[in-house]
Amino acid sequence: DSTRTFAKALAGTTILINNAIHPGEPDGINACLIWLDQWIAQGKPLESKNGDKLPVIAFIPAYNVGGMMNRSSTSRANQNGPEEYGFRGSTRNFDLNRDFIKMDSKNAFTFAKIFHSLDPDVFIDNHVSNGADYQYTLTYIASMKERMSPQMNELTYEKCIPYLTANVKQHGWDLFPYVELKGETPAQGIHAFNDLPRYAMGYASLFHSISFTVETHMLKPFPQRVQATLAFMEGIISFTTVNALEIEAKRSAAKLWARNLHQYAFNYQLTEKADSISFKGYEHSFPLHPITGLKELTYDRTKPYERMIPWFKTYIPKDSVSVPEYYVVGGQEQEVIDRLTANHVLFETLTSASIDTLHVFSVKSYKSPAQPYEGHFKLSQIEVGESERAIDLKPGDILVPSQQDAALFIHASLQPRAEDSYLTWNFFDSYLQQKEYFSNYVFKDQIADILAKNPQLQEEYQLRKATDEKFRNSEWDQLYFIYSRSPYFEQTFMRLPIYQKF
């Protein structure tokens, strides 16, 4: 049963292979079935031909069950087969491969239960690409090296990828990095993918799994894509089998690295530093389309080429913060606590009231989009002020220590300005709205007393009035300036229910 399998997985090296998170991209389902058929036909061996113990291999046949049931042959306009497939969106029309940190779906909670029960050393997410036309059937996305621990960076990029490239070549396939175009065509170069925690592989990387997204080419025939996916699977199984002890050791070292992190970097930006890579593509041109009358991009498969193109693969963090001893999350934030719990985050729940001096986050500004993204109006360009204050802690509030295996997940979700933090995903929007105001005709009679009791405010007010004509001519602006700095102003406005202790 599954419990025994999970126990066995925790005791050894484990691979988790995910399929059909986008059910219109079903190559991995068939590849896994073929692998299992072959394994059964061979007598269900538990060792490789060289006598090495096989890892525990767990398959998710179809992550997006709702999308799988929405069948058609038309939702993938640019894809070459199969005859029928599912739909990208879930029953609630979520792209579930954007849901791994915000966890809007039950799928994400179920996945977290599976993932943390297995604690996979290797995670594979099978997909089919969109984009340019080129000769490769099989491409891959590896986790962004700059966000990884030094141990997993070295293991992935210096050992695993070269091994996979050579292994699938023996099976007749070229393995190439995912063709994420820098411009309109490959001639302008390709760039490394930023696997944020919203994505399956980015999420898995937070827990130090070797993480890959397999991307077969949409225009290649379906049977060919399935065989290429199978070749990658066999390659990663072979690598994991041969290098099991090193993988286990490097992951343990990576967890220790994360527990002892002093500085957390985030908001990674792609640089203009370019390497070069040999690329097998097709010549392209821009003839006029007979219907639209406009220039169209066309690839000519009768004119294949192999040439060097730019490869942009270096990211640098725009921001970094010191790692606190622990975070405090208000006990009223049950949605946050549920997600921390689901991801095996360790925390202490307070049973009595107390007062502590904590590092407080106050939102100064942010941008909200005009259109929703995956069920949210995701915040960006967040500016946060920080200060030390005495905070009344209540029973039910939780203390989340940074020194634990889930450290990267904790920082990614609780640091307000991190790319996929819970603040950006609107978990704390209620704190961004003011709840109380004042009436001018009443409050104007109180300002003399407020200013008399606060000489610094009096000085700031007079300076603003002397230097800002708009302010000087607006009763509301003047009264609000004083009100927002007075004891009457609500303390919860723009102040997050997350604190830090250093």
List the predicted regions and their residue ranges.
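Structured catalytic-domain cores with a bias toward divalent-metal coordination
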Residues: 1-502
